[in-house]
């Protein structure tokens, strides 16, 4: 009988149903180790967005406007592409674009040329034509004091045959430069007896 009571007591103690009597030894239950804390997540600061195309364009114009460097423009040649014009038109049109212009210019950190300018010259009909705008050229330097450029100009002009109503123009630009003097030119596209004109001028850095 005494042996049966001991078995029952041991079973109840194992299940945790009864408190141990004085003198009874209860085996220690090993503690479950706590899970390690997750490492703190570091916040990554939001990177500042690069300026867009329009903002960069405006910054270039504004920086060029603040430049203290000036250059003089002297219109030199107007050439009507003979492949697109009848002979009588060639004989009729003016190809001596007398005029004058002035601009502000700068070279950026990459060595490229920027300018804001205004120019007046005689058009194909011997009428005064104004042109004002912004210009940019990628510059290559094949030798000391020699520069080659290619880029574009965007601006506003007005012509007598369009009642001097202003209209925008985007045109290509190329140049050959030596020290402070440059020969610069653009080509105006068009159709038969219209457009297809090479227009060139001298540019002198003051």
UniProtKB/Swiss-Prot annotation:
Query: EC class of this enzyme?
Result: transferase
Record-linked InterPro entries: LipidA_acyl_PagP, OMP/PagP_b-brl
Query: What residues make up the catalytic site?
Result: 80, 123, 124
Query: Where does the record place the site Role in lipopolysaccharide recognition?
Result: 89
For biological process, the GO terms are:
lipid A biosynthetic process
Does the keyword Nucleotide-binding belong to this entry?
A: no
**Listed GO CC annotations:** cell outer membrane
Q: Name one GO molecular function term.
A: acyltransferase activity
Q: Which residue stretches belong to region Disordered?
A: 26-50
Where does it live in the cell?
Answer: Cell outer membrane
Q: Which Pfam families match?
A: PagP
Task: Give the HAMAP family listed for this entry.
Answer: PagP_transferase
Subunit arrangement? Homodimer.
Protein name as it appears in the record: Lipid A acyltransferase PagP
Q: State the organism named in the record.
A: Laribacter hongkongensis (strain HLHK9)
**Source gene?**
pagP
